[in-house]
């Protein structure tokens, strides 16, 4: 049995991205963005996704990049619409027309990994029992909090429901690395100051907080803050920013301390932001960016 360095679990999403310049269709899903970013470290990466059988073609580009892929069948895939009405990359309106069937602890049967990253999109996709299974095996657990605080509203729009997250204490007590963005962090803590918000979240259990915002990322680890800017030559690929960032951070963190992992994640995310869809750059290009900056 292969032991992977990092297993990334999350639903495939069929994304419609709407900008003032036009509409594009993208194969999305946090697992997709995160896995391709993580593979740039050269580690052994496993991507586990749930989707409708008609969408299994998403596995092709991942396998071509050297990522092992497991596709689990669902009655439907998640269909998401992401609308960016202005030039502000953090101003967006999200809605869904269908939601994938949830994952289960048994989906990890036979999976051996040093670390597991859960990139759920909507509450209910990844149950607490799944996270407990990861921790029971002694693996490092990272999650993106969006998949626990976002719910589908009556009109199909995605909304934050931090107050209604009843399993918050149970989840955060299990997590080693927590990914959030500035909007989610404020919803969870009431703090607009990202450093205060990161410290507040760390006090609830996670050893490390990875917080993205429009200008870069902040990592709070070991009582210290580390930062890296996002400096794309042109902003063309906002969707998947956080997934790319956490995938690159967690994978690099398995090899290096927080400061180095933060710089690496900032570089990978910068290059991803220059193009729509998952990152299609090489590790050499990431290193070249770091040398220049």
Language-model regions, residue ranges each:
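Short beta-strand scaffold segments in enzyme catalytic cores
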Residues: 36, 80-83, 217-220
């Amino acid at each position: 049995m292969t032991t992977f360095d990092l297993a990334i679990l999350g639903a495939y999403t069929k994304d419609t991205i709407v900008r003032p310049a036009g509409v594009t269709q993208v194969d999305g899903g946090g697992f997709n963005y995160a896995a391709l970013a993580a593979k740039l470290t050269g580690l052994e990466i496993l991507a586990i996704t749930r989707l409708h059988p008609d969408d299994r073609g998403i596995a092709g580009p991942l396998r071509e990049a050297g990522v092992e892929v497991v596709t689990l069948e669902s009655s439907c895939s998640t269909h998401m619409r992401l609308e960016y009405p202005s030039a502000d990359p953090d101003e967006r309106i999200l809605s869904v027309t269908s939601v994938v069937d949830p994952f289960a602890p048994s989906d990890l049967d036979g999976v051996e990994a040093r670390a597991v990253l859960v990139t759920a999109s909507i509450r209910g996709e990844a149950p607490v029992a799944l996270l407990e299974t990861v921790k029971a095996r002694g693996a490092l657990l990272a999650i993106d909090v969006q998949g626990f605080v976002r719910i589908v509203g009556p009109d199909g729009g995605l909304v934050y429901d931090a107050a209604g997250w009843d399993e918050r204490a149970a989840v955060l007590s299990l997590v080693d690395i927590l990914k959030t963005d500035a909007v989610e962090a404020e919803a969870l803590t009431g703090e607009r100051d990202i450093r205060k918000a990161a410290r507040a979240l760390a006090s609830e259990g996670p050893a490390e907080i990875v917080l993205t915002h429009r200008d870069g990322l902040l990592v709070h680890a070991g009582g210290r803050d580390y930062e890296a800017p996002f400096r794309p030559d042109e902003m063309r690929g906002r969707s998947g920013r956080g997934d790319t960032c956490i995938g690159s951070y967690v994978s690099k963190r398995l090899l290096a301390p927080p400061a180095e992992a933060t710089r690496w994640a900032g570089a990978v995310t910068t290059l991803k932001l220059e193009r729509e869809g998952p990152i299609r750059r090489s590790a050499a290009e990431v290193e070249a960016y770091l040398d220049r900056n």
